[in-house]
Amino acid sequence: MTILAWCIAWVLDFIIGDPQHWPHPVRWIGRLITFVQHIVRRYCHSDKALRIGGGVMWIVVVGATWGMAWGVLALAQRIHPWLGWSVEVWMIFTVLAGRSLARAAQDVERPLRENDLAESRIKLSWIVGRDTSQLQPEQINRAVVETVAENTVDGIIAPLFFLFLGGAPLAMAYKAVNTLDSMVGYKHEKYRAIGMVSARMDDVANYLPARLSWLLLGIAAGLCRLSGWRALRIGWRDRYNHSSPNCAWSEACVAGALGIQLGGPNNYFGERVDKPWIGDAQRDISVDDISRTIRLMWGASTLALALFIAARCWLSGVA
């Protein structure tokens, strides 16, 4: 039944994704983060105090998320096994973000194909932290490809990884880790101290999933009739060409599969950030690379699900 729950949740995400106005645990986690952050900032003022308070915030948010998920699931199972199973499917469904990621990328791709640069910049600004107001088509394409490649890890592979390790409650706890990093894990002055623990722990949580993404995206590239060998080679060569210890693993693999170059200089919060280049520019990046990257994302997602199901079956057999 557990494996069936995984599969149904994955299929639901593939077909419908997260309905825009439905209640979603990430929104609840976000409200909890805002509430706890407000308390921390009220009592902590020095950088040292903010770092300690940020660590306490991380423990409270992640612990509360895991505890609530475990409690709701246990209560539902006690009421009726089928209710418990349905709640498990719903929880898994909410931690997967494949369809939402694909939709967000396509929302940028669509106006770009229609030469509506202003609209594509607006839609891109919803999913990236960089300044999009002056970006040209090539830069927009690059930003979308990077976003899909990076979020293949924390939107799909990592949730499935923690689902395999500890069931739906641990997958929900990972989502809290990821949401904390998204909200406070920045390096600029406002969040540098309070978000330090959140940023570091997100790096720790994604360490293995990011490296697994290199292998899965490389295999997916071959299955998608792209260059799987080049994806693995470039992915390995450029795996550290990023300020994050994890992001370049998936981005470099996608760059290698497509034969394009990612990274380079961008503006974040009014500051120019010069990132290393990732990949080899064997050709110019194009709008078609967005749809190719989405296919790679779905390929890696399918392979991850199959891998964890096989591992679960093998461990069950051994036990």
Swiss-Prot record:
Pathway: Cofactor biosynthesis; adenosylcobalamin biosynthesis. It comes from the Bacteria. One of its GO terms (cellular component) is plasma membrane. Its main location: membrane. GO terms for molecular function: ABC-type vitamin B12 transporter activity; threonine-phosphate decarboxylase activity. The chain crosses the membrane at residues 56-76, 82-102, 153-173, 204-224, 296-316. The keyword Cell membrane applies. Keywords: Cell membrane, Cobalamin biosynthesis, Membrane, Transmembrane, Transmembrane helix. It is found in: Cell membrane. The keyword Cell membrane applies. It is a multi-pass membrane protein. Pfam families: CobD_Cbib (PF03186). GO terms for biological process: cobalamin biosynthetic process. Converts cobyric acid to cobinamide by the addition of aminopropanol on the F carboxylic group. However, the true cosubstrate could be (R)-1-amino-2-propanol O-2-phosphate, leading to cobinamide phosphate. Belongs to the CobD/CbiB family. NCBIfam families: cobal_cbiB. This is Cobalamin biosynthesis protein CbiB.
